[in-house]
């Protein structure tokens, strides 16, 4: 509980610092850009988010999508971002676990904020992030002197038990 409270205070501190910082915050808005949302958002949801965020003079905002080289999530793009806003709808398995781990490693190192929108809670990056949280939670159950001796591993592949579209 203390660790989570410290994390929360840390996030609040980073947020407050960003608000008053002289430097702009670099935001990468990622969108899977598949056809269904285009029926509602002619220019895709991610681009609407980008257009809105660009109104804030404290933000440098870039758009990326799954159809770009390296699925819009190149090392360079991630390194140049302070925050990744990830909009997903149905192409949740199209980002590899390796790429997802790159995102999560940056989040854990405090180099990248990660905001998951719409149904991206089914995405591989979010699921890998939740595995990391589960591993940390499991280790916290052990006495501190034993934690370094334990290697948490996951058996099998990520599972998708998504509800049916009409549920």
Q: Where does each model-flagged region fall?
A:
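Bacterial N-terminal signal peptides
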Residues: 7-17
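Aromatic-Pro/Gly-enriched surface loop or interdomain linker
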Residues: 20-81
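The substrate-binding groove and active-site-proximal loops of carbohydrate-active enzymes
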Residues: 36, 85-94
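A cross-family glycoside hydrolase active-site/sugar-binding cleft signature
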Residues: 64, 87, 117
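A glycine-rich, often tryptophan-bearing local segment used as a flexible ligand/cofactor-contacting loop or short
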Residues: 91-167
């Amino acid at each position: 509980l203390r660790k989570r409270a410290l994390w929360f205070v840390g996030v609040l501190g980073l947020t407050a610092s960003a608000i008053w910082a002289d430097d702009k915050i670099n935001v990468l808005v990622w969108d899977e850009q598949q056809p269904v949302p285009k029926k509602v958002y002619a220019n895709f949801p991610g681009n609407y988010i980008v257009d809105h965020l660009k109104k804030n003079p404290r933000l440098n905002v870039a758009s990326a999508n799954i159809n770009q080289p390296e699925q819009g999530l190149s090392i360079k793009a991630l390194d140049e971002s302070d925050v990744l806003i990830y909009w997903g709808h149905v192409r949740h398995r199209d980002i590899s676990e390796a790429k997802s781990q790159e995102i999560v490693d940056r989040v854990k190192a405090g180099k990248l904020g990660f905001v998951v929108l719409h149904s991206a809670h089914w995405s591989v990056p979010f699921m890998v992030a939740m595995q990391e949280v589960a591993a940390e939670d499991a280790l916290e159950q052990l006495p501190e002197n034993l934690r370094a001796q334990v290697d948490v591993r996951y058996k099998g592949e990520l599972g998708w038990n998504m509800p049916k579209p009409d549920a």
